[in-house]
Each structure stands twice: as C-alpha cells, then as structure tokens.
C-alpha cells in the first residue's frame, strides 16, 4: 500500500471532522451569496491557483464561481518570477480588482503557508469590499513561519472563516531521512477536498429548499452545451472571466 495514499486518506478524514463547523459556515455564506445574486470567488497564488481552476467553469461545478488568479502568480507562465510576485501585496489587490469582488460575495483564498503578501492582500482587499473571506491554509505551516505581508498578518488573520487543511509544514508528506528533501505534496488535494465539501453542502441546501443550484454540465456530453447556455446567460454579465 502507498504511504502517501494512506496518510492522505487520514488527513482527509481528519479534515472533514475537525473543520466541520468552519466548512458549514463557508457553505452558509456561499448559499447566502448565491441567493442574493452574488458570486463565489476562489483562487490563490502559486500552486494554490489550482483552486481557481477547480472551481471555475467546471463540469459539475458552480456557474456562480469566479476565478482569482494572475498570470504573474501562476508558475507555468514564469516559475521563478511567480515566487517573487506572490510576495507582493500589489499583485493580490490587483487580482481582486480584476475579479470584481463586491459587497455580499464570498471569497475563498487558498495558501499552504498563508504568509505571502499577495494572498493576504487578496483577503484584506476582499474584506474591504464587503465580502466574506474564507481562508484555506495550514496552521502547522503558518505557525512556523513569519508573515511576509507588511501588516504582519497571516492569511488566517485576514479571514472571517478559517479552514485548516492540516497539511504538514513544507507541504511534502513523505520524509526520507536526515539531509534529504521530503516529497509528495498534499496541500492541493486537501484544498480541492475543502472546495468539494463546500460545493456539496451548497447544492444540498439549495435542493432541499426547492431552489435551482447553478451547476455546469459537461460540454463533452450530449445536451451539455444547451444546458450551459442558460448558465452563461445568467452569469456571463457578471463573471468577468466568462
């Protein structure tokens, strides 16, 4: 059996129990946002940008979702430069401005360490606009490193709702002994699991109330394009990335 798989399954199970109340709070905020005609923004910097990709324009995902990201913050475009750019608060504020975050929206910001200027600024800028901010980060990692944001705040400090992934310090799950780098990161898996738990909760509440959950269908399945036209008509005027 795989050590990574065993430990990942343990972390997922622990997260679901330990963070149940915080996840429920995030679900409640997202439901209120959808009911008021607002948007659910999600993203981060570096590999946490995967949250933007997973949540946005995704078969089975929310049509009310809007991505928070930036080319300068995404490693595939310029890896070494992105490491420096994610430390810059200006980049974080610019990402929120591009997304068009508004009062009443719910904003999910992911960051393994929660120390860099851009994600912390994303949270602060969103809160200034009246949005509810949900931080997805690792307390284990954050506790061992100093914030790089000018305020001295970690991402957790700038959020209304905090969800701790439980990912290990340094992200890598498997140790190899003294003098060797640990390997097999797990933060992306845990972050996407958090998003999926929130998505599940949102749809269940809307369904139970007899309301329509705005969900995309696969464009690679019969009828998908036709279904999605309805979602586009409703959300393209507001979601800038559409």
Report residues per predicted region.
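Generic N-terminal amphipathic, Lys/Arg-enriched alpha-helix
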Residues: 1-18
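Ligand-binding pocket scaffold of soluble enzyme catalytic domains
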Residues: 11, 39, 53-54, 179-182, ...
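A short N-terminal beta->alpha junction/helix N-cap motif
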Residues: 13-21, 39-43, 122
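A short, well-structured juxtamembrane/interface segment
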Residues: 18-35
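Flexible, glycine/charged-enriched surface loops at secondary-structure junctions
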Residues: 21-26, 40, 207-216
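Glycine-rich phosphate-binding loops that contact phosphosugars or nucleotide phosphates
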Residues: 35, 41-200
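Internal, active-site/partner-interface "lid" segment
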Residues: 171-175, 204-229
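Long, charge-rich low-complexity segments
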Residues: 237-242
């Amino acid at each position: 059996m795989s050590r990574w798989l065993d430990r990942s399954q343990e972390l997922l199970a622990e997260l679901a129990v330990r963070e149940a109340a915080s996840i429920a709070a995030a679900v409640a905020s997202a439901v209120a946002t959808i009911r008021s005609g607002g948007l659910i923004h999600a993203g981060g910097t570096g590999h946490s940008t995967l949250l933007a990709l997973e949540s946005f324009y995704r078969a089975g995902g929310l049509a009310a979702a809007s991505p928070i990201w930036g080319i300068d913050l995404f490693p595939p475009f310029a890896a070494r430069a992105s490491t420096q750019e994610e430390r810059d608060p200006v980049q974080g504020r610019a990402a929120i401005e591009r997304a068009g975050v508004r009062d009443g929206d719910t904003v999910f910001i992911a960051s393994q360490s929660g120390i860099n200027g851009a994600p912390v600024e994303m949270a602060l800028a969103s809160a200034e606009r009246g949005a509810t901010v949900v931080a997805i980060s690792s307390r284990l990692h954050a506790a061992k490193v100093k914030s790089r944001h000018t305020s001295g705040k970690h991402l957790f400090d700038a959020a209304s709702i905090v969800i701790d992934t439980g990912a290990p310090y340094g992200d890598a799950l498997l140790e190899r002994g003294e003098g060797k780098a640990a390997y097999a990161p797990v933060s992306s898996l845990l972050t996407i699991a958090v998003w999926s738990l929130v998505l599940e909760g949102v749809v269940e509440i809307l369904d139970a109330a007899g309301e329509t959950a705005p969900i995309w269908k696969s464009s690679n399945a019969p009828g998908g394009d036709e279904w999605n036209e309805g979602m586009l008509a409703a959300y393209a005027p507001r979601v800038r990335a559409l």
